[in-house]
UniProtKB/Swiss-Prot annotation:
UniProt name for this protein: Uncharacterized protein YtqA
InterPro entries: ELP3, Elp3/MiaA/NifB-like_rSAM, Radical_SAM_C, rSAM, rSAM_horseshoe, YhcC-like
A Pfam family recorded for this sequence: Radical_SAM_C
Domain Radical SAM core: 26-267
Key words of the record: 4Fe-4S, Iron, Iron-sulfur, Metal-binding, S-adenosyl-L-methionine
Source organism of this protein record: Bacillus subtilis (strain 168)
Length: 322
């Protein structure tokens, strides 16, 4: 804990439980995530469960900053690692399978892809982004095996707890499916990171707070809080043109994220609290490209409030006793 910072899971001015802090505590040194494109598709695009994909999702399957899909995984990894090494000379790496749905393949395909990068020098773990409806038993069994011998996260896209919004964004699974996916993974002790998005069409502050509260009540170990950013070429552009989407202001976003941080468990690891997209594809909100300004504003607001992650968190058993 840093002097004048009451939050226990921090050794800087940050008043929330950053992934960087967690990884340093776990491994004892700096660890970087290397975002890869494993060449997968998505069941919400290829017709397995639906067509068209989530309306906010880019042509890169939300992997706009991942490696080049046309390169093999080893080439992708080394290209990104070498760029990172120019700035940070020391550190280890987590292979992050980010683009599309990274369990949407037979187990033997998953094994070939995941094991190839885990065998690389300085790779200490793997993070796998997927959908809760893409966790058949044999895949979960393989993930459980991975979890026994390496550092593993499975990242699941919830986005919102509200079924009306889920239909509007064509998520193509319901909240119960999400809960079942979490439970399948947690049965094997696998770390789960929930993704939520602030600023989805027709959602107000209370709805976004309800999504954060739902995540707080789940047995998940991490959360990514994204800002919705609208990209050219996505289906959501049509919703925007029809007036179904208004961008959050920077101040509203900062206030909202601080409110959300206050109600999630202090031990929950915050993998992200903002987001941006490729500048050449961005329609808005354009303030989001100033990521460091947004991060600074969030921490400043928490400081001004005398607050921190988990200040108002109540566990379900505590609530039921009230």
């Amino acid at each position: 804990m840093m002097q004048n910072n009451p939050f226990p899971y921090s050794n800087t001015e940050k008043r929330y439980h950053t992934l960087n802090y967690h990884l340093r505590e776990h491994f004892g040194h700096k660890v970087f995530k290397v975002a890869l494109d494993g060449g997968f598709d998505c069941p919400n695009r290829d017709g397995t469960v639906a067509h068209g994909g989530c309306t906010f999702c880019s042509a890169a399957g939300s992997g706009d900053f991942a490696g080049n899909r046309t390169d093999d995984l080893i080439t992708q990894f080394h290209d990104i690692k070498n760029r990172m090494h120019e700035k940070w000379k020391d550190g280890k790496y987590i292979a992050y399978f980010q683009a599309f749905t990274n369990t949407h393949a037979p187990v033997e395909v998953l094994r070939e892809k995941f094991e190839s990068v885990l065998a690389l020098d300085d790779v200490v773990g793997i993070s796998i982004a997927t959908r809760p409806d893409c966790l058949p038993d044999d895949v979960v069994d393989y993930l459980a095996e991975l979890n026994e011998r390496t550092y593993l996260w499975v990242e699941l896209g919830l986005q919102t707890v509200h079924e009306r919004t889920a239909l509007l964004i064509n998520r193509a699974h319901d909240f119960n499916c999400y809960v079942e996916g979490v439970n399948k993974l947690r049965k094997h002790g696998i770390r789960v990171c929930s993704h939520i998005i602030n600023g989805l069409p027709l959602e107000d502050r209370d709805m976004m707070m309800e999504t954060a509260k739902a995540v707080a009540d789940l047995d998940v170990q991490g959360i990514k809080i994204h800002l919705l950013h609208l990209l050219k070429g996505t289906p959501m552009v049509k919703q925007y043109e029809k007036g179904k989407l208004e961008f959050l202001s920077q101040d509203d976003y900062v206030q909202l994220v601080c409110d959300q941080l206050e109600i999630i468990p202090p031990e929950m690891i915050v993998h992200r609290i903002t987001g941006d997209g490729p500048i050449e594809l961005m329609i808005g909100p354009m303030w989001s490209v100033n990521k460091w300004e947004v991060l600074g504003a969030i921490n400043k607001e928490l400081e001004n409030r005398g607050s921190y992650q988990g200040k108002f968190f109540q566990r379900l058993e505590e609530e039921s006793a009230l």
